[in-house]
Structures are given as C-alpha cells and as structure tokens.
C-alpha cells in the first residue's frame, strides 16, 4: 500500500511527524496527501531511513539541490561532498543528475551520504548507456528508457523526474512556431530528439500505465517533468509550454487514481510579471498538485549571478503558490558547480523560500523574524548569528572588520541608530 493510499484510511506515523514539525493538524495533512495536494517523497524501502519531508499545500516552501557528475568532470567524492554540503546548509531534498562515471554507484553513494529524499532523472542513464555502446542517444528504444526507470526504483530513489507529458502536439508547436532557445530541458531534449528521429509519440507517455505500476510497487513519487519549459524569457508561456501543462494535468489525475504521489515541474525562464499567472494556471490545471519550479529565472542576462535571479523569481513564485524551489547556482549556464556554488545556491533559495513564507503568514517565519528583530534591538550579535540563514558569513564580516566598541559594528560605530535611540530613551527615564 502506498502512502497516499494509507492516508485515505488513517494517519501514518510519517505524516504525524511532519504535521508536528509544520504546525498543522495531522488529519488535515493526511487528507491533503490522500488528495494529492501534498507529497511525501520516500521510497517504500527507505521510510525509516529518510527524513520525512512534506511538499505542498499549507506547508513551508521546500528547496531542492541538484548534484551529479558530467562527462567533463567526474569525481564521485566531490558529488558526495556537494550533496552533504547542500543538506548541511538547509536543502530539503537532493537530486543526482550524474551523466559521467559509474552512475549506479554514484547514485547509491549519494543516497547513503544524506538523510533527505533523493531524486533522479532515469532517462539520463538510458542516454549515457547508448553513448557508451558507441551509438546515438536516439538509437535507444522504449525498453531502454523503461529499464532505466525500473533500475532507479529498485535502487530506492524517493522521487524521479519523468518526461511523460511532452507529446507530438507540443513538439509540433516548437518546430512550427519556433523558439529563441528551442528545448533546454536535458531530459526533454533527449525524449524530443527520439520522437523526431522515430517520428513517433513519446514512449514515456504511451507507457505511463506501466510507469505507474512500477511507482506504485515501490511507492516512488513521480515528478512530472516539463520538457517544454522556456529557456529564455522570450519563450515563456507559449503554446508548447501550455500544451504540455494540460497533459501534466491529465497525468496527475491518472497518478491519483493509481494511488501514486505526483508533483508537477515548471519553468524555467519567465518574466517577473508573468510568474503569478504561471503558478495560478498550474494549480488550476493540475488540481492543486505540488508545483516544483526551477527558479523561475526572470532575466536572461545574469550569468554568474543566476542564483540571485532565480531567488527573485522563486520568491514571487512561492508567494503565489509554488511549493518546491529547485535551486540555481552561480555556475548555472556556465559550468558544473563546485561545493561553494552549491552552498551559495542553497542559501539564495532558502532566502527566497523564507521571504515567501513570511509574506504568506507562516508562523515559523514570523517567529524567526521576531527573534532576529529582538536580537538586533539588544545588539546581541551572537544571537543574530545563530538565527541567520548562514551563520558563518555574518560572523566572518564582523571578525574581519571589527568595531571599536564591542556592542556596535564598523558601519555606524558611535552613530548606531539603535544605540542612539536606546540612550535617549534611557536618559528620558
């Protein structure tokens, strides 16, 4: 029995634990899981190993960090270090997107190294296997794709991206109308290239019932990939993106009927003014399914600083209802991220999530803001560091540029606004 099915009968211990952490009633949370409005990614064999994480309606915004090798840079030890660094700095989940080295061994090592849910994109592995046989990626058949999915589920991944919603109709829109950047989803491009080469419908769409059987057997959460996500703000909200969204909504219904948890992936590069509409449309078409967005990135001209751009878009998206933010690092569009990039990406995305939760009136966010305000009023620097999203950086600044008076900082010194006012109030007494 899957967790979704359990929640239709009772309140599982996993759900009770999440409810306590989130400050919601267990019965309400179980109902949302049963309805598909909240997902709890945890493979059937890993429920006791993975820290339970709820993603969706009424819960704090969660963040994901991507790690993984490439054909250019393949250091499994580094990827394990990156995964641990991401979790240490507050990532709620990790995805292994490896395309270089022993993919299965890397996946298993990352799953063993962290205690949060781990996701993957199996079609990458299917493509890599074809390349290693000296053949083109498009030479794979549907069995190659499905075997990769099955293998990842057998290995115990908690959630996986499956690009099942890109159909010939959506692909035709791209080919006929054109796009500034075509298809930028790596998994989406692999599937689309296969469809073009074989002049055939997406085998992941046509075999979705079989994928559901596998997911139900292992209780793996499906993350319905957005192959047609815009890679430029110029391509946002075009016909192809919307056609795929409609199919994602159809697949959400089929997942729920099968008792399989599902979330929906979204863009991508989207102008700031269009982000609220993107979220509202997804929530309507997909009947409240958890929304997992990459960014969104609201401008194309910030290479090297895309973690900042994505945090801006992510805060807007999350405030309007996105549930799950995939981090973007400073290396996005440029190179494989290193540990420092991963940390910066996680911190930027945590800021976006906290800003959104503050605006949404989440109690934990208000409490943390109140505690920080109190620490600042008291000029309690150690407490401020404890409350900071990243305690190390503010402590470093203060130690590197110390003030003359211990209770002040080197920005204002004796002209500190708080101290001036407090002294005046004390004198008045």
From Swiss-Prot:
Keywords for the protein's UniProt record, in alphabetical order: 4Fe-4S, Iron, Iron-sulfur, Lyase, Metal-binding, S-adenosyl-L-methionine, Thiamine biosynthesis, Zinc
Binding site for [4Fe-4S] cluster: 409, 412, 416
Cofactor detail note: Binds 1 [4Fe-4S] cluster per subunit. The cluster is coordinated with 3 cysteines and an exchangeable S-adenosyl-L-methionine.
Record's keyword annotation contains Nucleus: no
Any single Pfam family the record assigns to this protein: ThiC_Rad_SAM
Biological function: Catalyzes the synthesis of the hydroxymethylpyrimidine phosphate (HMP-P) moiety of thiamine from aminoimidazole ribotide (AIR) in a radical S-adenosyl-L-methionine (SAM)-dependent reaction.
Catalysed reaction equations from the record: 5-amino-1-(5-phospho-beta-D-ribosyl)imidazole + S-adenosyl-L-methionine = 4-amino-2-methyl-5-(phosphooxymethyl)pyrimidine + CO + 5'-deoxyadenosine + formate + L-methionine + 3 H(+)
Family: Belongs to the ThiC family.
EC number: 4.1.99.17
Membrane spanning residue stretches: none
InterPro entries: ThiC, ThiC/Bza_core_dom, ThiC/BzaA/B
Residues noted as binding substrate in the record, renumbered to the chain: 66, 95, 124, 163, 185-187, 226-229, 265, 292
KW S-adenosyl-L-methionine (keyword) present: yes
Phylogenetic classification of the source organism: Archaea, Methanobacteriati, Methanobacteriota, Methanomada group, Methanopyri
Residues bound to Zn(2+): 269, 333
GO molecular function: 4 iron, 4 sulfur cluster binding; carbon-carbon lyase activity; zinc ion binding
Class of this enzyme: lyase
Recorded metabolic or biological pathway in which this protein acts: Cofactor biosynthesis; thiamine diphosphate biosynthesis
Name of the protein: Phosphomethylpyrimidine synthase
GO biological processes: thiamine biosynthetic process; thiamine diphosphate biosynthetic process
Cofactor(s) listed: [4Fe-4S] cluster
């Amino acid at each position: 029995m899957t967790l979704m099915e359990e929640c239709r009968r009772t309140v599982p211990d996993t759900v009770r634990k999440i409810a306590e952490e989130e400050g919601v009633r267990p019965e309400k949370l179980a109902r949302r899981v049963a309805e598909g409005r909240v997902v709890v990614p945890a493979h059937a064999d890993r429920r006791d190993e993975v820290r339970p994480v709820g993603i969706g309606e009424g819960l704090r915004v969660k963040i994901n960090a991507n790690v993984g090798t490439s054909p250019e840079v393949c250091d499994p030890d580094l990827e394990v270090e990156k995964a641990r660094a991401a979790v240490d700095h507050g990532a709620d989940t990790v995805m292994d997107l490896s395309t270089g080295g022993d993919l299965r061994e890397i996946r298993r090592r990352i799953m063993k190294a962290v205690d949060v849910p781990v996701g993957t994109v199996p079609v990458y592995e299917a493509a890599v296997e074809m390349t290693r046989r000296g053949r083109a990626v498009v030479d794979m058949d549907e069995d190659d794709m499905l075997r990769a999915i099955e293998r990842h589920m057998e290995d115990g991944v908690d959630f996986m991206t499956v690009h099942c919603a890109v159909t010939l109709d959506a692909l035709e829109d791209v080919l006929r109308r054109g796009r500034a950047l075509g298809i930028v989803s790596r998994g989406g491009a692999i599937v689309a290239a296969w469809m073009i080469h074989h002049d055939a419908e997406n085998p992941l769409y046509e075999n979705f019932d079989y994928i559901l059987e596998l997911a139900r057997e292992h209780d793996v959460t499906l993350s319905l990939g957005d192959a047609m996500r815009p890679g430029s703000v110029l391509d946002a909200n075009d016909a192809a993106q919307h056609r795929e969204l409609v199919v994602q909504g159809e697949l959400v219904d089929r997942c729920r009927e099968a008792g399989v948890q599902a979330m929906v992936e979204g863009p991508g590069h989207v102008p700031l003014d269009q982000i609220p509409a993107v979220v509202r449309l997804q929530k309507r078409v997909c009947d409240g399914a958890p929304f997992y967005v990459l960014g969104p990135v609201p401008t194309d001209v910030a290479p090297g600083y895309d973690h900042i751009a994505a945090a801006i878009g992510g805060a807007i998206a999350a405030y309007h209802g996105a549930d799950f933010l995939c981090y973007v690092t400073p290396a996005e569009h440029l190179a494989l991220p290193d540990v420092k990039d991963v940390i910066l990406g996680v911190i930027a995305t945590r800021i976006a999530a906290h800003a959104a939760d503050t605006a949404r009136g989440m109690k934990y966010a208000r409490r943390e803001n109140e505690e920080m305000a109190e620490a600042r009023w008291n000029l309690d620097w150690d407490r401020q560091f404890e409350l900071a999203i990243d305690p190390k950086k503010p402590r470093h600044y203060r130690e590197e540029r110390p003030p003359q008076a211990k209770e002040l900082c080197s920005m204002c010194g004796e002209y500190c606004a708080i101290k001036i006012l407090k002294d005046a109030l004390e004198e008045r007494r």
